[in-house]
């Protein structure tokens, strides 16, 4: 009776019986996998609670501050919690950091000086970082300040090109940036273990080089984080995993004290650093979001695995595949046509609690070199821990799906995306057998 009620409710929301029953079959096959995700979430939940208890979080920490923000107890305690949770010496966690790209730019520009060289040993960075670095000319880029950039691509099988990485490291190499997630690429996301192996290799050649990890989309997916395996600095956004869907803005930098201090002086000004920067009225959402982040991340991870198994079964190329271990919440699905990419995103939008009536269309989004389509009926604009999908309108027409504040919402989004493809005859009933 209960299962019939659930199926009927999905049907009322536009999911056909064929699509729902196909999804139910896939879901039933994933029970053991989902149990393992829940175990990781439980460990990470204890890790967050432990960090909060050790740093004596109190109700006073949730008070609003304004003006200069001197002696902001909530802000200062939260940064201690982040440092404890991610195993860093210090942390900078601020609403004044507007997004992940801003956090990364802040970390790079504060720790590099003219004449230094930045090395990416994992290939091309995320599109928005190309202008930060100066790969694509932009005002205020690293290149404008005389900071050079060198890149070593991954090998065709996704492994590190150790030979050319060794050749690329020279006396000017000051900072190495390692992007954990795939971005708009179909390369594998890096596990914490693989990141550790790469850092060990790099530091065996040049021990004093700073190794920074772009940790976006990866927090709480595994039991360990990059600082546990030798990274000097990790950087991310609070409207992704660690904000738990509640943080309305913000970014973080955690790691070696000197690296974090440099970032703080760049964010505010020399002589002020971490001492200023009011937390306004968002500080309680930062705490509460971090508290529930492990469980929210687990729901998003289940959604990604569900999507991989559904679309792989239908014959589409997916990265990671349905059985691979997971190291971030992003799922790439290659839909092979602009029609497929647009239909998928329309399905995600139609499943949203906010702006479900809106039809997403491709547009020239700032920071990207091709039109991008985005679906995100979110409570927080741009939040990618909430159910969202996006992709550039260029071959191979891959969509990047992520998020879902609950597993059930992620499930609805995937089924709705499939429904849209089904209605446009881009998949058929025979494929869902």
Regions picked out by a protein language model, each given a short descriptive name:
Residues 2-27, 31, 38, 48-54, ...:
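Conserved PLP-enzyme active-site core in the AAT-like
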Residues 61, 65-66, 92-95, 329-334:
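Short glycine-rich or small-residue beta-strand-to-loop segments that form or flank ligand, phosphate
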Residues 66-74:
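N-terminal small-domain helix-loop-helix segment of the aminotransferase-like
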Residues 85-88:
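Flexible linker/loop signature enriched in Pro/Ser/Thr and Pro/Gly
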Residues 312-432:
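Conserved C-terminal alpha-helix-loop-beta "cap" of PLP-dependent enzymes
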């Amino acid at each position: 009776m209960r299962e019939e009620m659930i199926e009927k409710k999905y049907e009322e929301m536009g999911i056909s019986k064929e699509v729902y029953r196909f999804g139910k079959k896939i879901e039933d096959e994933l029970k053991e996998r989902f149990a393992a995700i829940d175990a990781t979430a439980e460990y990470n939940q204890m890790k967050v609670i432990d960090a909060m208890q050790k740093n004596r979080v109190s109700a006073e920490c949730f008070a609003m501050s304004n003006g200069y923000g001197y002696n902001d107890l909530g802000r200062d305690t939260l940064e201690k919690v982040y440092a404890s949770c991610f195993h860093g010496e210090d942390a900078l966690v601020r609403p004044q950091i507007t997004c992940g790209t801003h956090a990364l730019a802040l970390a790079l520009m504060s720790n590099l000086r003219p004449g230094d060289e930045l090395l990416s040993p994992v290939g091309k960075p995320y599109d928005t970082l190309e202008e930060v670095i100066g790969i694509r000319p932009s005002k205020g880029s690293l290149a404008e300040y005389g900071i050079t950039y060198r890149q070593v691509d991954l090998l065709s099988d996704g492994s590190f090109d150790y030979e050319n990485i060794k050749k690329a490291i020279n006396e000017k190499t000051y900072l190495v940036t390692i992007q954990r997630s795939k971005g708009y690429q179909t390369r594998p996301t890096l596990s914490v273990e693989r990141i550790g192996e790469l850092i060990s290799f790099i530091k065996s050649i040049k021990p004093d080089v700073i190794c920074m990890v772009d940790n976006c989309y990866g927090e709480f997916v595994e039991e360990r984080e990059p600082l546990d395996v030798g990274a000097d600095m990790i950087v991310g956004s609070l409207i992704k995993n660690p904000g738990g869907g509640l943080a309305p803005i913000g970014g973080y930098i955690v790691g070696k004290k000197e690296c974090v201090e440099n970032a703080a002086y760049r964010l505010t000004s020399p002589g002020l650093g971490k001492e200023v920067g009011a937390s306004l009225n968002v500080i309680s959402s930062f705490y509460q979001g971090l508290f529930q982040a492990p469980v929210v991340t687990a729901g998003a991870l289940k959604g990604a695995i569900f999507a991989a198994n559904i679309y792989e079964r239908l014959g589409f190329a997916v990265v990671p595949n349905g059985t691979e271990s997971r190291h971030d919440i992003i799922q790439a699905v290659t839909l092979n046509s602009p029609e497929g990419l647009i239909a998928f995103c329309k399905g995600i939008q139609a499943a949203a609690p906010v702006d479900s009536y809106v039809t997403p269309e491709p547009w020239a989004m700032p920071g990207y070199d091709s039109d991008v389509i985005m679906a995100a009926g979110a409570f927080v604009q741009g939040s990618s821990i909430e159910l969202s999908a996006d992709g550039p309108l260029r071959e191979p027409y891959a969509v990047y799906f992520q998020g879902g504040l609950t597993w059930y919402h992620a499930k609805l989004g995937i089924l709705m995306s499939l429904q849209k493809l089904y209605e446009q005859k881009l998949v058929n009933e025979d494929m869902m057998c």
